[in-house]
Amino acid sequence: MAAGGAVAAAPECRLLPYALHKWSSFSSTYLPENILVDKPNDQSSRWSSESNYPPQYLILKLERPAIVQNITFGKYEKTHVCNLKKFKVFGGMNEENMTELLSSGLKNDYNKETFTLKHKIDEQMFPCRFIKIVPLLSWGPSFNFSIWYVELSGIDDPDIVQPCLNWYSKYREQEAIRLCLKHFRQHNYTEAFESLQKKTKIALEHPMLTDMHDKLVLKGDFDACEELIEKAVNDGLFNQYISQQEYKPRWSQIIPKSTKGDGEDNRPGMRGGHQMVIDVQTETVYLFGGWDGTQDLADFWAYSVKENQWTCISRDTEKENGPSARSCHKMCIDIQRRQIYTLGRYLDSSVRNSKSLKSDFYRYDIDTNTWMLLSEDTAADGGPKLVFDHQMCMDSEKHMIYTFGGRILTCNGSVDDSRASEPQFSGLFAFNCQCQTWKLLREDSCNAGPEDIQSRIGHCMLFHSKNRCLYVFGGQRSKTYLNDFFSYDVDSDHVDIISDGTKKDSGMVPMTGFTQRATIDPELNEIHVLSGLSKDKEKREENVRNSFWIYDIVRNSWSCVYKNDQAAKENLSKSLQEEEPCPRFAHQLVYDELHKVHYLFGGNPGKSCSPKMRLDDFWSLKLCRPSKDYLLRHCKYLIRKHRFEEKAQMDPLSALKYLQNDLYITVDHSDPEETKEFQLLASALFKSGSDFTALGFSDVDHTYAQRTQLFDTLVNFFPDSMTPPKGNLVDLITL
């Protein structure tokens, strides 16, 4: 705080002047200095590398040391094959020793892009004098790299930079000393360790870990070490580690309670193309409609998670002033007002006429159990025409509904009739629930402008209630499978292309052409995608598999939680079917973000031998990370395993008893891998000391080296701020 209680003003971020210092190459007149001027309409105003063979780079030298916070890339006025699809930025006080500040890519458009560079270590700003830009991939395969214009911004006020420079020098010195301390302790150079620590007064780690090293490595007090780990777990010190672990999916088939003898009438039957929504407050799943293989359905169900029971709200909603039987419609729920909306449907070409092609729009009130027709024809009210395979999202806070895409049904011939006129797709609409008015936000567009969006069917669309954006990806347009991914800010009416789908990241993103069901967790900033079966018969039975993906919104990265790469066989193993749902399409997936559970029902298994077959299985899916209890048990297992191995060398009989009792209880005997590892431990009873492998610590005894290795393993579970440095001194030696 400044004098008088006023908050000190944030240091001013301004443009940082720089000069071109070094470069890998350049071609013809495309000189490195060209990046100093911004001329988006001049095609020659750029640096272009002579080749795309690595390493290609530009090194910029700032006029004086500065905290470099942002880098801005200017571009040519049109898309260009030489634009950087992937690049990295490094920075440092000298050109020989640089830290990675950014790894990213440019969109292939004409808009300037600004990126935030890493400029803090442990919340402390650090300065740079040199910035190195390393192109990795251009938008056109095998084209040279081009950079049109670069702007650096940050803080170069000496009054701010100098203290940061002093801190950075001190930080590097401190880390070097900590690496030495770690090395000395690993090799049991006690005098050197104590002398250096006494002289520098630098701590290698948190006192708790020093205590653990003393108890475990020096004294071999394994019981005290276990107590220390238990305290750490209970104090939440392993939480950071848990949050960084990958999810593991846990499917469970739900067998609902049966109230009637025959068990048929008290749960929804087989179907595909149905719709589900979930009320997370009451833990109730609502299911409406679908196609059972021969006809559309109009039944309406509620499943109570707490009661594990389905209730039939209505056998035929049309008889209760609700929607007629339908499939390929969409539903969304307003949890605040406890209302469900439904729009759209598929109609066979044989029953299409001007009356049946009207797009009706209904609202169901949960508390009063009543349906209300909001519109006989949304197109006449300024909304979408009759569509199917569209997407619909609810914004409860602003009481708005967004609907995007879907195929518009027309009278002229079948949807699959190639002689029919080109298929029409619906744009992006907003419905104001309060005023009951529609607004067209984006028409279907084939243009590639920054604010244009291409309509499609079978895509995923999700609303992030916290950052107030719609996320759209995947889908199909005529015969083309789309792989783009964009967000739409509902408040600013702005489209942001996350991925244009041209990246050849096969295996790193969910594959196109497969039915995808997606959910969102606004609290965790995650999008979940279950990828199932393709609707295309040709693509269907090559390699049927389910895969589950998670997109981290903040990190802008996909990760595959699992794939079951079983080949498609008519006789899928029974055991597999009991463990997880078989691949399918036309199913429904909903997510309870409060209790972190997914629910899946029904669908079409795509069996060519029985095309009318539909499913009525019901599953829950939990994404699990290691729990605190699991980590505590695992750490105890590691400690006791080591203790057993030490005992086995000294007193095999005592070791055997320890193995059968103390070590036995730390093993999960339902886990085949853990059980196998446990069974193999008995072989240690028959090993001689010479059988044990050296750990590279030739100057310390085997016991000390083994305990040090166990200590290093246990340290990995603690937060980085508490642990010794990750690197090793010997790794700095270059050959």
UniProtKB/Swiss-Prot annotation:
The cross-references to PROSITE patterns, in alphabetical order and at most eight, read: CTLH, LISH
Mutation: Y53A; reported impact is: Reduced head to tail dimerization
What InterPro entries does the record point to?
A: Beta-prop_ATRN-MKLN-like, CTLH_C, CTLH_complex_component, Gal_Oxase/kelch_b-propeller, Galactose-bd-like_sf, Kelch-typ_b-propeller, LisH, Muskelin_N
Q: Name one GO molecular function term.
A: identical protein binding
Q: Tell me the residues on which N-acetylalanine occurs.
A: A2
Q: What is the effect of changing F184A?
A: Reduced head to tail dimerization
Question: Where does the record place its Kelch repeats?
Answer: 284-330, 339-391, 400-458, 469-515, 526-578, 597-651
Q: Does the keyword Acetylation apply?
A: yes
Report the subcellular localization.
Answer: Cytoplasm; Cell projection, Ruffle; Cytoplasm, Cell cortex; Synapse
Q: Name one GO biological process term.
A: regulation of cell shape
Substituting R185A results in: Reduced head to tail dimerization
Q: Where is the LisH domain?
A: 172-204
Tell me the keywords, alphabetical order.
Acetylation, Cell projection, Cytoplasm, Kelch repeat, Repeat, Synapse
- What is a single cellular component term in the Gene Ontology annotation? ubiquitin ligase complex
Q: What sequence ranges are listed for the domain CTLH?
A: 206-258
Domain topic, free-text comment: The LisH mediates head to tail dimerization.
What is the purpose of this protein?
Answer: Component of the CTLH E3 ubiquitin-protein ligase complex that selectively accepts ubiquitin from UBE2H and mediates ubiquitination and subsequent proteasomal degradation of the transcription factor HBP1. Required for internalization of the GABA receptor GABRA1 from the cell membrane via endosomes and subsequent GABRA1 degradation. Acts as a mediator of cell spreading and cytoskeletal responses to the extracellular matrix component THBS1.
PANTHER family the record matches: MUSKELIN (PTHR15526:SF5)
- State how it assembles: Homodimer; may form higher oligomers. Identified in the CTLH complex that contains GID4, RANBP9 and/or RANBP10, MKLN1, MAEA, RMND5A (or alternatively its paralog RMND5B), GID8, ARMC8, WDR26 and YPEL5. Within this complex, MAEA, RMND5A (or alternatively its paralog RMND5B), GID8, WDR26, and RANBP9 and/or RANBP10 form the catalytic core, while GID4, MKLN1, ARMC8 and YPEL5 have ancillary roles. Interacts with RANBP9. Part of a complex consisting of RANBP9, MKLN1 and GID8. Interacts with GABRA1. Interacts with the C-terminal tail of PTGER3.
Q: What is this protein called?
A: Muskelin
Name the gene that codes for it: Mkln1
